[in-house]
Amino acid sequence: IPQAPVPAPAPTRTLDAYKAVVAHHVMQRNPERIFEGELPPMLPAVVVLNITVDREGQLTDVQVQRSRDQGASEVALASLRRSGPLPPPDGLGPQHADLMTFSETFLFGERYRFQLRTLAGPQRAGL
């Protein structure tokens, strides 16, 4: 009697877990740009990037989804590009998808230093 094919194992990673791995990777590659400590209650700039990677983690597209500060946008884009290739998104997305897109938010403190929302702690309370 022929046996039924064994289904592929379910992906062990979630998008949130992958984003945390990517955020650590970006921070390790940009130590001079990281904002240490608690973020201020009123952030000078917030930049949201849409990031597309292939199966190997190569950046194929990066777009600014939201920003009101051109300088912060340039720092976010340069920091991400300097971090490439990113870790590969193993087991995420449709089975035969060649590309995966996700977003990350850069939270800027003073002097264009940032934290990534995926890993950022709480902000200081307002006055």
Regions found by a protein language model. Name each.
Residues 10, 14, 68:
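Conserved acidic
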Residues 41-48:
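Short, small/polar residue-rich loop motifs at catalytic or cofactor-binding pockets
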Residues 1-9, 24-32, 54, 58-65, ...:
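Conserved "boundary/linchpin" sites in short secondary-structure elements
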Residues 36-40, 92-95:
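Short, solvent-exposed loop/turn elements at beta->coil junctions and helix N-caps
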Residues 66-72:
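A short acidic/small-residue loop/turn micro-motif
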